[in-house]
């Protein structure tokens, strides 16, 4: 595998869309495929940075970083971290997370939050190694 290069996606191109269609089902089998218009909305939004990890020309990982201001400060949240099954264990997830943490800090966030299912043992181990701490909180979701 070539050296991993991580960069924000700045153009909603066909290769990024194809990568989303290939990678997102590896994260969530219940998610609907993203459309080119939806990808364009993500890329154009000031509140979202979509990072792509490439090995050569192939996109082998994605991470979405949401950054937003609320009355108590700038918040950052990592979502939809996925590394292709063929590239796991090769530093792709770490490279994506480090890029997101750097961008969040550059934009003024003091903390970055994420959630991860307990069954994702390797991912949880990575987050802890990177310095994430498990919070004593409840996470709630309201389905609309």
Where are these regions (language model features)?
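Acetyl-CoA-dependent GNAT
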Residues: 3-74, 79, 97-98, 103, ...
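Conserved GNAT acetyl-CoA-binding A-motif
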Residues: 104-116
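Conserved acetyl-CoA-binding loop-helix of GNAT-fold acetyltransferases
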Residues: 83, 89-102, 125, 129
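Short, contiguous strand/loop micro-motifs
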Residues: 26, 87, 110-111
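Conserved active-site alpha-helix within GNAT-family acetyltransferase domains
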Residues: 94, 118-136, 141-142
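Residue-level recognition of the GNAT/N-acetyltransferase active site
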Residues: 84, 117
């Amino acid at each position: 595998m070539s050296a991993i290069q991580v960069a924000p996606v700045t153009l909603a191109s066909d290769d990024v869309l194809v990568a989303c269609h290939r990678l997102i089902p590896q994260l969530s089998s219940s998610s609907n495929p993203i459309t080119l218009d939806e990808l364009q909305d993500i890329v154009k939004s000031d509140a979202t940075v979509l990072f792509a990890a490439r090995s050569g020309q192939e996109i082998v990982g994605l991470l979405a970083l949401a950054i937003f201001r609320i009355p108590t400060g700038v918040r950052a949240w990592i979502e939809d971290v996925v590394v292709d099954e063929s590239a796991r264990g090769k530093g792709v997830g770490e490279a994506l997370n480090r890029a997101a943490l750097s961008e969040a800090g550059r934009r003024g966030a003091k903390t970055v939050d994420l959630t991860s299912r307990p069954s994702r043992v390797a991912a949880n181990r990575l987050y802890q190694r990177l310095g994430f701490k498990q919070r004593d909180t409840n996470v709630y979701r309201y389905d609309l």
